[in-house]
A protein has these predicted regions:
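Hydrophobic alpha-helical transmembrane segments and their immediately adjacent juxtamembrane loops
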Residues: 4-15, 19-22, 282-376
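Peripheral, non-transmembrane regulatory/ligand-interaction domains of membrane transport proteins
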Residues: 2-263, 269-270, 283-286, 293, ...
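Long amphipathic alpha-helical coiled-coil segments
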Residues: 262-274, 301-309
Length: 376
């Protein structure tokens, strides 16, 4: 008896290699056992999430490709590729959570070693720098369900060359999804640099929305503060400020690297592409200035709330102090005259009780006058 176990992932089965085995007890029978590779969700067996070939002069300017088609196209020399399409380039988007993604890139993409070093260096600040004849970019973006939590920020690594653009991420990001939607709608970037510029503008649009949502939240808190309904939950402002600070730290491009890049761009980058990249960088600067202004508003609100909390605490302490001062004369008098010893004054006096009441009232009035005079 032979048992064949088929491994599936979702509704797909992906064969990798096969081996032939003889079934014992069955004459002339063979068993073909397939070794299946289970890919990560949303990507193929190479970790490729999506791939597009852009050929400006072809009948089909934009064509979706899989990892095998991409490897075949990349194996061509630039001369062979230019004979088929004058300005063709390819965009490949990989899932770094897939074990085969980096191996496939090393085997077929021919990327600079700086790109792989950037994947492992642990530095996630936004930057664009030149490595050999390509551009290496690190862009930070937000997840689809951004809820103003620091964990909702993730990183996109990019390698840009004249024929190939590679983007890689560990978690789904909005900017890549916006680019995929634009490509499917027919808005295809004309060059690899324009694709990078499109990603940067998409990220800037996301930041604008974050600033807008953050402004709405702060406006609501300000209205509550002015109306006297604020519950003093400064944790909301603290979380929002931490997220904005982290966003600004991660998203602010490194000016020195950008300056060097724009001053001496690669030879394959056209002047118009360099100008568009410079314009996208300026958009980033505007959004980051707005984000800095938003942080200042949050800081002022936190100071105002802290002042209100201190004022409430001082008021409560004053009330407790007044109560203590007012109760002090009667407590002292009751303590002295309540002792069960001989020689207590006014013990035999017929008006002794009222005399003590008068003394207590007098000292209480004097203590109250002193306390309220200090308050004024």
């Amino acid at each position: 008896m032979c048992v064949v176990i088929w491994l599936t992932h979702g509704r797909r089965t992906i064969p990798r290699r096969s081996a032939t085995w003889a079934c014992p007890g069955v004459l002339g029978s063979t068993l073909v056992l397939q070794d299946w590779t289970i890919g990560a969700y949303g990507s193929d067996e190479a970790g490729l999430i999506c791939g597009y070939l852009f050929e400006a002069g072809a009948a089909q300017p934009v064509r979706a490709v899989d990892s095998s088609q991409a490897a075949e196209w990349l194996a061509r020399t630039p001369v062979q590729e230019r004979a088929g399409a004058e300005r063709a380039y390819m965009w490949l988007h990989f899932n770094l959570s897939h074990a085969q993604a980096e191996r496939w890139l090393m085997r077929h993409a021919g990327l600079s070693d700086v790109f792989y070093e950037t994947l492992k260096d642990g530095l996630h600040s936004t930057r664009i720098e030149r490595a050999d004849d390509s551009l290496i970019a690190v862009i930070n973006d937000v997840h689809f369900e951004f809820s103003f939590e620091p964990s909702d920020i993730s990183t996109l690594w990019i390698s840009v060359g004249p024929r190939l653009v590679v983007t890689a991420r560990s978690q789904p990001l909005r900017s890549v999804d916006a680019l995929r939607t634009a490509v499917k709608a027919g808005d295809a970037p004309k060059s690899s640099t324009e694709l990078l510029e499109h990603l940067m503008r998409a990220q800037a649009d996301v930041l604008v929305k974050i600033v807008r949502d953050g402004t709405a939240r702060i406006d609501s808190i300000e209205d509550e503060l002015l109306a006297g309904r604020l519950d003093h939950k400064r944790a909301r402002l603290g979380t929002l400020r931490r997220v904005l600070v982290r966003l600004q730290r991660l998203l602010a491009p490194e000016p020195a690297a950008l300056f060097r890049l724009l001053q001496t761009p690669p030879l394959w980058m056209s002047e118009s592409d360099a100008q568009q990249l410079r314009a996208a960088t300026e958009e980033f600067s505007v959004v980051l200035r707005d984000m800095g202004a938003l942080q200042e508003r949050i800081k002022l609100l936190q100071e105002e709330i802290a002042a209100n909390v201190n004022e409430d605490n001082n008021r409560s302490l004053f009330v407790l102090t007044v109560v203590t001062v007012l109760a002090l004369p009667i407590n002292i008098t009751a303590g002295l005259f309540g002792m069960n010893v001989g020689g207590i004054p006014l013990a035999e006096h017929k008006h002794g009780f009222w005399i003590l009441v008068g003394i207590v009232v007098t000292f209480t009035a004097v203590a109250a006058w002193l306390a309220f005079r200090k308050k004024r």
